[in-house]
């Protein structure tokens, strides 16, 4: 039981360092860009599939 407590404590410390540091803002910016890229790719895939069936 103590082993799991130490493991979760270490994970919490790592998450705090990454979250409270400047890495979170940079990752959020990259995530926004990737969201729009994959949204466009999904729409293109749906449209090409719709036109291919006709």
UniProtKB/Swiss-Prot annotation:
Alphabetical UniProt keywords: Cell membrane, Membrane, Transmembrane, Transmembrane helix
TM ranges: 5-25, 27-47
Main location as per UniProt: membrane
Keyword Cell membrane: yes
UniProt keyword Transmembrane present: yes
Places the protein is found: Cell membrane
Membrane topology, from the record: Multi-pass membrane protein
Gene Ontology cellular component annotations, sorted alphabetically: plasma membrane
Any single Pfam family the record assigns to this protein: DUF1328
Family: Belongs to the UPF0391 family.
Protein name: UPF0391 membrane protein Bpet1858
Organism: Bordetella petrii (strain ATCC BAA-461 / DSM 12804 / CCUG 43448)
């Amino acid at each position: 039981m103590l082993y799991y407590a130490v493991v979760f404590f270490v994970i919490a410390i790592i998450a705090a360092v990454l979250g409270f540091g400047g890495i979170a803002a940079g990752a959020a910016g990259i995530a926004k860009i990737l969201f729009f890229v994959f949204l466009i790719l999904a729409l293109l895939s749906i449209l090409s599939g719709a036109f291919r069936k006709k």
